[in-house]
């Protein structure tokens, strides 16, 4: 399980340090792809394979299903951290997430997310302001 928030700097070669805590759970190879809210999702291979099985069940006749699968897979890449624990963020993913120098990596249950510091700060501020309303809307999940 992934949890926590870590701040790191992306270097001029688009390399980003993945926190040791996340590397242990991600394994030696994992998958990065476009995420919602203009971030990058990172999945351990086992989670990615489970997600793939679910995506294969989407009806090809539905335009939205085809669009989602294309969008999700087209930017997906397998990553292997180097000896310093860095990964190379492909330009397409970096652009999607508006990554600049300062980045935030967060753990979200079965995946990690990589955010630009600016976008994460904005998202966090809005979520915090609306947390009570969000929690109330989640009552069906019986926290």
UniProtKB/Swiss-Prot annotation:
Q: Say if the entry is tagged with keyword Chaperone.
A: no
Return one GO MF term: DNA-binding transcription factor activity
Q: Name one GO cellular component term.
A: cytoplasm
Q: Name one GO biological process term.
A: negative regulation of DNA-templated transcription initiation
Coiled coil, from the record: none
CDD domains to which the protein is assigned, alphabetical? MraZ_C, MraZ_N
Spell out the InterPro entries in the cross-references: MraZ, MraZ_C, MraZ_dom, MraZ_N, MraZ_sf, SpoVT-AbrB_dom, SpoVT-AbrB_sf
Q: Name one Pfam family in it.
A: MraZ
The SpoVT-AbrB domain covers which part of the protein?
Answer: 5-47, 76-119
Q: Where in the cell is it found?
A: Cytoplasm, Nucleoid
Q: Name the UniProt key words of this record, in alphabetical order.
A: Cytoplasm, DNA-binding, Repeat, Transcription, Transcription regulation
Per the record, the domain of life is: Bacteria
On assembly, the entry states: Forms oligomers.
- Family according to the record: Belongs to the MraZ family.
List the protein's name. Transcriptional regulator MraZ
Source organism per UniProt? Latilactobacillus sakei subsp. sakei (strain 23K)
Gene that specifies this protein: mraZ
């Amino acid at each position: 399980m992934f949890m926590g928030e870590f701040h790191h700097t992306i270097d001029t070669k688009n390399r980003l340090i993945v926190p040791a805590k996340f590397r242990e759970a991600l394994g030696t190879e994992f998958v990065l792809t476009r995420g919602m809210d203009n971030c990058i999702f990172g999945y351990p291979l086992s989670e990615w394979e489970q997600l793939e099985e679910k995506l294969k069940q989407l009806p090809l006749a539905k335009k939205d299903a085809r669009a989602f699968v294309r969008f999700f897979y087209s930017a997906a890449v397998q990553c292997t951290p180097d000896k310093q624990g860095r990964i190379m963020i492909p330009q397409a993913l970096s652009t999607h997430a508006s990554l600049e120098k300062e980045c935030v990596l967060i753990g979200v249950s079965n995946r990690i997310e990589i955010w630009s510091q600016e976008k994460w700060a904005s998202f966090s501020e809005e979520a915090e302001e609306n947390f009570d309303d969000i929690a109330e809307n989640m009552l069906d999940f019986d926290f």
